[in-house]
């Protein structure tokens, strides 16, 4: 069925005009953006299929190739979908500029969307000023955290350059299990000692998963 064959009150554009944007489903919102379907399926059916098979969270992370596995989604529509989610990420980033850290949850929220590939471990250092506001962040390494590979010099070099009052380490666990490994604890201990010498406080080390986090500070693993 073509979109124009639907009852006017069921068409996304008309529903938008009558009831407002918040009344639309996720599939209807996406249909407004990519607009056209195929001879086999109208655009609303295509978007319902796309979201139904993936969910919004997974959809936001799909590659161009993965998006095009859905019938009716070609390169142009895949680019439109990726552009929408990229704008959403940038809005989130802009709202978190100079974010004040009061808890590990603040750091978890700040890091949303900043890990480019969740299938690999990424170690970041966040630089904070005297008000505990995040002034910048820096990607240190990609790969399994290991004390023999992570040198304090690499961590604190950027902190000195940014005139940081304190730093927070953040790294992700692709498995989703946020419990710290022995290597995580060893790296944290080494970096906390180095920070005390440089008088740059290691405020926290936070391990993130998909929907959870572990804070060394909140679990009293930092002095």
Swiss-Prot record:
Keywords: Hydrolase, Metal-binding, Metalloprotease, Protease, Zinc
Binding site for Zn(2+): 171, 173, 184
InterPro entries hit by this protein: MPN (IPR037518), RadC_JAB (IPR025657), RuvA_2-like (IPR010994), UPF0758 (IPR001405), UPF0758_CS (IPR020891), UPF0758_N (IPR046778)
Family matches, as Gene3D superfamilies: Cytidine Deaminase, domain 2 (3.40.140.10)
Annotated ranges, domain MPN: 100-222
GO biological process: proteolysis
Motif JAMM motif mapped to chain: 171-184
This protein's record includes keyword Protease: yes
CDD domains per record: MPN_DUF2466
GO molecular function: metal ion binding; metallopeptidase activity
Pfam family, one: RadC
Protein family (similarity comment): Belongs to the UPF0758 family.
NCBIfam families xrefs: PRK00024.1, radc
Stated name of the protein: UPF0758 protein Cphamn1_0831
């Amino acid at each position: 069925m073509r979109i124009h064959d639907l009852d006017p009150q069921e068409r996304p554009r008309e529903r938008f005009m009558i009831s407002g944007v918040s009344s639309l489903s996720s599939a209807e919102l996406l249909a407004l953006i990519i607009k056209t379907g195929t001879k086999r399926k109208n655009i609303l059916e295509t978007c319902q299929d796309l979201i139904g098979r993936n969910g919004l969270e997974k959809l936001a992370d799909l590659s161009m190739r993965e998006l095009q596995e859905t019938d009716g989604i070609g390169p142009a529509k895949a680019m439109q979908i990726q552009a929408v989610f990229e704008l959403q990420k940038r809005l989130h980033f802009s709202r978190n500029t100079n974010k004040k850290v009061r808890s590990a949850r603040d750091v978890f929220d700040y890091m949303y969307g900043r890990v480019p590939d969740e299938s690999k471990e990424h170690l970041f250092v966040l630089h904070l000023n005297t008000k505990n506001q995040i002034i910048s962040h820096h990607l240190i390494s990609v790969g399994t955290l290991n004390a023999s590979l992570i040198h304090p010099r690499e961590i604190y070099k950027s902190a000195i350059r940014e005139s940081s009052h304190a730093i927070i380490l953040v790294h992700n666990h692709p498995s989703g299990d946020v419990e710290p490994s022995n290597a995580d604890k060893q790296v944290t201990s080494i970096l906390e000692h180095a920070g005390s010498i440089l008088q740059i406080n290691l405020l926290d080390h936070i391990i993130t998963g998909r929907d959870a986090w572990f804070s060394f500070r909140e679990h009293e693993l930092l002095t």
